[in-house]
Amino acid sequence: MRSIKVEHYEAFSTVPSKGNPAGIVLDGKGLTDSDRQKIAKEVGFNETAFPLPSERADVNIRFFTPGHEINLCGHATMATIYALKTKGLLPDRDEITIETKAGILPIRLSIDVDRSMMITMKQAAPQLRAFSGSRSELAASLALEEKDLHEELPVVYGSTGTWTLLIPIKKLDAFKRMQPNNQHFPHILQEMPRASVHPFCLETYDQEADMHARHFSSPYSGTVEDPVTGTASGVMGAYYHKYIESSPSLQLIVEQGHEIGKDGRIAVTVTEQTDDVMIEISGNAVLIREFEVRI
């Protein structure tokens, strides 16, 4: 058996235990995809990232849940870039590129007003697709009633790299009542049975935030809930622009994680382009600890 060093970071917060955890394996030389999957399962976080050399970008990042590989993960990207930058493993410039299975994506690095590193990541082109399943069954899968869903806003699938089902909820208090039946999601999400589920609303705990959300995992991922979700927050920006406020430029704050003891914040920028919108998410990260797993 091999002993693999894993670094535990939390993204979208600078306060330990308040962000979204990700495992980072910096020395992944010689690992097979089967090895990476075993490591992700042993680590047990929603995502574990494996930075690798790239011939097309400054770094290639692979993302694994405990159950399978995914194309892109926002919080694990933030954590990986933070780790590489603070260890001097990235080029000494403010703009870099990363290779992912969602494409080549630009990353911008800056120093925030409190001297913390801010990482801005362009998302893949947003896609929104209709949901034709049962709204009542969907609500029941979250231990809600159909009347908790917003009547004037649509339920749609969305992606800026990873597909999720965006579910507009009327009131903030419904989020404390949610008890997801993840195993039932594929039956309801017939168009995309492997998608995750992302309820959100326009009421927030923080008056400076624009949207509140929770994120429930696909049962195939091996996890139940994601504390603070970058890619889903990005596509929420595209949803907001299409269905709520179609301004040429939007600066949004998404809050997530309160119901499970987290307190994450994700900055989402939406910019109109000629025939689409550009989505960027911004956040930071903090190192928690190092540990080892054996495979």
UniProtKB/Swiss-Prot annotation:
Alphabetical keyword list: Isomerase
The protein's enzyme class: isomerase
Database matches in InterPro entries: Phenazine_PhzF-like
Gene Ontology cellular-component terms listed: cytoplasm
EC number per UniProt: 5.1.-.-
Domain of life: Bacteria
Active site: E47
GO-annotated biological processes: biosynthetic process
Pfam families in the record: PhzC-PhzF
Protein's name according to its UniProt entry: Uncharacterized isomerase BH1950
UniProt organism field: Halalkalibacterium halodurans (strain ATCC BAA-125 / DSM 18197 / FERM 7344 / JCM 9153 / C-125) (Bacillus halodurans)
